[in-house]
């Protein structure tokens, strides 16, 4: 017993390979029988590749259903300041001690199907009208917490740079190596913001400084931290976790 208590804490970096192994496909493998998968998808399941193809088909079907049911007019629940979770839990695909500092020359790049590709400095972003929210952050791991953010509505920003609002995807890249993407309808939902502040203070590195996506209508892994580039595109961009089998639409 004492040897267990004296063991050093395991970092996220050490357990990350195991977490990746236990992703969404693993969950589906454990809950759906091969017979059910065959009936649902029509794939031959005698090999691992057949099972993976069947699970991929189910995930794509799930994405299509969620997209069809999504409404930009349906808002995530908001809360009073008294409901804010303190202390707020750090969460990322790496340990907190591995948080990267903001690059000295940081700018937000804008590309793809937009008219104005000029980069944005933090000062330019802060000069835009900001919108606040107190909403629930829901993690795919099964826990949630309530936080307060404020920032630029993503829809207003996309209109300002002349984005093609009929495009299918908005892709986000981060200077910590993370990436994710969302559908255009979700990007234009009024609560989707490019957050600059957390609890009425400029974002600190562990909370995604200097700029993060905050999208309360989706699971937490879609609210990418440490943004450095936004791209509007019709080509499916995937994402860090999405490319490993996680649900792409990830609605809540």
Give the predicted meaning of each segment:
Residues 1-22, 36:
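N-terminal secretory signal peptides
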Residues 4, 23-24, 28, 71, ...:
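Short, intrinsically disordered low-complexity segments
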Residues 9, 25-29, 33, 68, ...:
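General helical structural elements
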Residues 19-28, 52-55, 66:
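Twin-arginine (Tat) signal peptide motif
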Residues 26-47:
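N-terminal export signals
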Residues 45-252:
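Structured, non-membrane catalytic/scaffold regions adjacent to prosthetic-group chemistry
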């Amino acid at each position: 017993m004492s040897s267990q208590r004296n063991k050093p804490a395991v970092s996220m970096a050490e357990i990350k390979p195991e977490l990746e192994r236990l992703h969404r496909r693993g969950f589906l493998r454990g809950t759906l029988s091969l017979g059910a998968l065959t009936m649902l998808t029509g794939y031959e399941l005698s090999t691992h590749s057949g099972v993976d193809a069947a699970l991929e088909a189910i995930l794509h079907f799930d994405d299509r259903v969620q997209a069809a049911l999504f409404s930009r007019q349906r808002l995530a629940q908001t809360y009073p300041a008294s409901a804010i979770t303190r202390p707020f839990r750090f969460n990322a695909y790496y340990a907190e001690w591995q948080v990267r500092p903001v690059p000295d020359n940081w700018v937000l790049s804008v590309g793809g199907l937009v008219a104005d590709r000029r980069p944005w400095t933090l000062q330019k972003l802060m000069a835009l009208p900001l919108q606040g929210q107190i909403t629930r952050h829901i993690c795919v791991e099964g826990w949630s917490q309530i936080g307060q953010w404020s920032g630029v509505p993503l829809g207003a920003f996309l209109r300002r740079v002349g984005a093609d609002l009929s495009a299918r995807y908005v892709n986000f890249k981060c200077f910590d190596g993370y990436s994710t993407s969302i559908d255009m309808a979700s990007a234009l939902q009024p609560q989707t913001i490019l957050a600059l502040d957390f609890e009425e203070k400029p974002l600190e590195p562990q909370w995604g400084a200097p700029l993060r996506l905050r999208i309360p209508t989706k699971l937490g892994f879609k609210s990418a931290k440490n943004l450095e580039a936004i791209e509007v595109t019709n080509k499916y961009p995937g994402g860090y976790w999405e490319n490993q089998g996680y649900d792409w639409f990830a609605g809540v």
